Structure formats: C-alpha cells, structure tokens
C-alpha cells in the first residue's frame, strides 16, 4: 500500500511539472538580493528548458520588466540583468517575500509581501516605470530630456534628426519639433540651420557640440558612445551597456554587423566581467581605422532590424575637435562655425 502511495506521489509530481500550465515558487529576500535573485533549484531543474534567457516580470500594478536569467558554474539559475530595476521600483527590503507565478512561456506574475506584516505591500499595486530615470532640462530648448546613463554610454529619449552623411551644417536647438528620424531627415535644410550647441560639459569646443547633436539624433532604440582613448587607441574596445544588450537580446557571444552608408564591418560581441557586461573587440579596431575615429568623436548606434540575425547596427558619426585627419577620410559629420 505504501509503495502504491509513493508511486502515486511520484506520478503526481511528474504530472505537475510536465503538464500544469502555471507553476509557482516563493523566494525570501536575503542579504545580497538587490542585484541578483536565485531561482529555487528544484524549479530551475524542472523548468530549465522552458526558461528563455530573457523573461518578463509582471508587477501587481501591471508594469512589466525584462530581466535576464543567468546560470553560474554550479548550475544555479538567477534573475540578474534588469532585476535591480524591479527591486528599486518596488522598494523591496530584506525579508520581504515574493511569490512568482510562471505561465510556462516567458512571463512571471509577481506578488510582493511585506516581511514584517506578512501581508501584500499595497504600494506594489501603484508602481509606475517613470519616476526613477535621471532627468535633465535643456535650458535653451524649453523641453525636458530624459536620459539613462550607463558608464560612458548615453541614451536619450528626445529626438532630433540624423543629418545626412558627409554634410557640414549649422544646427539650432529648439527650432525643430521632436519628431521621428526619417521625417525630419527629409525636412532638414542646410541653409536654415543655426548652430547654438551648449549642453553637458564633456569637453570644450566642438566635442561638446558633437555630443549635443548626437543626443538629439538618437532614437529610443539606440545608444551613443563618446569616444575615449580606450575606444580608439589603447584597448580599442567598445563597451555596450548590459541593459541595452538585454533589451535587444545581445546576451551571448555572437556576430554583429556595423554599417556606415553602404559599407559594412563584421565584428564579434563577447560577454565579460561579473556584471555581465559585453562589448566588441574583434573587428572594432578595423572599424576605427577605416572611419578615422578619434577621441572626442561621438557615435550613435541604431539597430537596423531587430529580427535580423546577426544583429545589424547603423552607425552615425559626429566629429569632435577639428584636427587634421589621416588616411584622407572625410568626416561623416562635421560642425562649422
């Protein structure tokens, strides 16, 4: 009789893990939870094949977060990239209890319980993903620009047009509406633009102007890099922020194609460091040399098509200080006084 009961329990457990559409687990927030949350081993063992590298966490408020799932050398799986944003927005504290409901595809519904009262946190139902980004106001333009800063890479939601390659133009802040890339690119005229770039004190002169133009050319899907010595001379390595990588599923070693006008460069993306950051070394030096990149230049990277494999990035180059260029390479974007 006992053997039959044991057999029944094994069968029931197998049925649960293999056929139930929704599965649950709970996790107590222990010290060190801010940047990484371990998934219970039994859950990860049974659901490993079902778990993609990027999952969606759905807050009680309905707000969703894209979070990366990583596996260490001991086969322990954990929420990693993007988890810190979920923690911050929900003001999670040590000893809080979370209940995860897995729908069998890539989404978890999350309930948040207070560790002291053992009741749900009411505030978790009123979370909005809009209050934690660093905001700066451009005094001369009259609009508020939201920026997400990551190391030496900036992304901006405010948009101004990308100027046609190889053109030398004058640019005025605030003269043109914040509309899309393609429409504004058609409407721009080199004759009626007036340069008044005066934003962050990254460097003096043309470098500051190049950065200002690049920030207003970027789309919400892109990122920009202010070229430092490590990018173009010493290490010759391009670091890409892990949040952008997670959003675009650039989380494993893979090929990347960069394009300026009709010319393409094949490169390799690699993961490095404990934080899970990634970047490009193989192929980047060739890109730097062919495009005569220097310190102070600014590059805007825009995904050409998220469905294309390998990932294609269109690159727009804004020249910094007007120094003599070698190799007879014309600037892609220049700034005239």
From Swiss-Prot:
**Where found in the cell?**
Nucleus
Q: Which GO terms describe its molecular function?
A: DNA binding
Q: Does the keyword Transcription regulation apply?
A: yes
Quote the InterPro entries the UniProt record gives: B3_DNA-bd (IPR003340), DNA-bd_pseudobarrel_sf (IPR015300), REM16-like (IPR044837)
Q: Which UniProt keywords apply?
A: DNA-binding, Nucleus, Repeat, Transcription, Transcription regulation
Q: Does the keyword Transferase apply?
A: no
Signal peptide residues are: none
Cystine links in this protein are none
Pfam families for the chain: B3
Write the protein's name. Answer: B3 domain-containing protein REM16
């Amino acid at each position: 009789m006992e053997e039959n009961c044991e057999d029944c329990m094994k069968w029931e457990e197998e049925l649960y893990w293999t056929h139930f559409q929704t599965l649950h687990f709970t996790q107590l927030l222990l010290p060190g939870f801010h940047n990484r949350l371990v998934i219970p081993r039994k859950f990860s063992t049974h659901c490993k094949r079902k778990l993609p590298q990027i999952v969606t966490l759905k807050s009680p408020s309905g707000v969703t977060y894209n979070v990366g799932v990583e596996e260490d050398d001991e086969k322990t799986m954990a929420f990693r990239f993007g988890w810190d944003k979920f923690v911050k927005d929900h003001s999670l504290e040590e000893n809080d209890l979370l209940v995860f409901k897995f729908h069998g595809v890539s989404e978890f519904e999350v309930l948040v319980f207070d560790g002291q009262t053992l009741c749900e946190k009411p505030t978790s139902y009123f979370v909005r993903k809009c209050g934690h980004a660093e905001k700066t106001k451009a005094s001369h333009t009259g609009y508020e620009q939201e920026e997400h800063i990551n190391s030496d890479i900036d992304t901006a939601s405010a948009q101004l047009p990308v100027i046609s390659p190889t053109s030398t133009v004058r640019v005025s802040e605030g003269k043109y509406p914040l509309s899309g890339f393609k429409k504004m690119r058609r409407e721009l005229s080199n004759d009626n633009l007036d340069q008044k770039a005066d934003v962050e004190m990254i460097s003096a002169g043309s470098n500051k102007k190049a950065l200002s133009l690049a920030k207003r050319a970027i789309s919400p899907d892109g990122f920009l890099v202010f070229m430092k010595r490590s990018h173009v001379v010493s290490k010759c390595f391009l670091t890409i922020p892990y949040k952008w990588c997670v959003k675009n599923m650039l989380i494993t070693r893979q090929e990347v194609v960069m394009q300026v006008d009709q010319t393409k460069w094949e490169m390799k993306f690699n993961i490095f460091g404990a934080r899970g950051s990634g970047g490009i070394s193989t192929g980047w030096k060739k890109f730097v040399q062919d495009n005569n990149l220097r310190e102070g230049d600014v590059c805007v990277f825009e995904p050409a098509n998220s469905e294309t494999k390998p990932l294609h990035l269109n690159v727009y180059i804004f020249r910094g200080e007007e120094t003599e260029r070698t190799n007879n390479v014309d600037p892609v974007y220049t700034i005239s006084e």
